[in-house]
Amino acid sequence: MLNLAPPVPVAPSALATCDPLVVNEHEARAVGIGTDAAGTSLDAWRDLGASAVGRIARSVVVTLGSAGAVAASAEGSWTAPAPRADTVDTTGAGDGFTGALAAFLAEGRSLEDALRFAVAAGALAVQSRGTVDSYAPRDAVLRSAGLEDGPETA
């Protein structure tokens, strides 16, 4: 897993091993996923992410701020719209997203579920001031994402 923030030059051979490569829309463009004309819809970014699988990285996650995020791998591609949130402070939301994504993937959960969990974590994080104090407890994130606790059984 590589979170390419801020974007720095990375050898294509190193990017090719990323599973997933995590980027925001600006970083995505910097590595060749999309252009300024890519549009802003989740579906458009999902399709761009899917086109990058195998070409740029093993799997791709693109974060899109208050719109949510998308992910793609050889198994498929997904959108996760962000729930409406009363934004107080966005500091640390990206780190909260990435940490939640990494935690769920480390548990053996699917990329699709990890994406939903991470979007919920990021959306909850922006509703409080600060960084660590704004991260919601696991059970609150699970409820927000509509997921159950425990390892993936499928």
Each predicted region: which residue ranges?
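Conserved beta-alpha-beta core of the PfkB/ribokinase-like small-molecule kinase fold
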Residues: 1-44, 67-69
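Conserved phosphate-binding/catalytic region of the ribokinase-like
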Residues: 9, 34-154
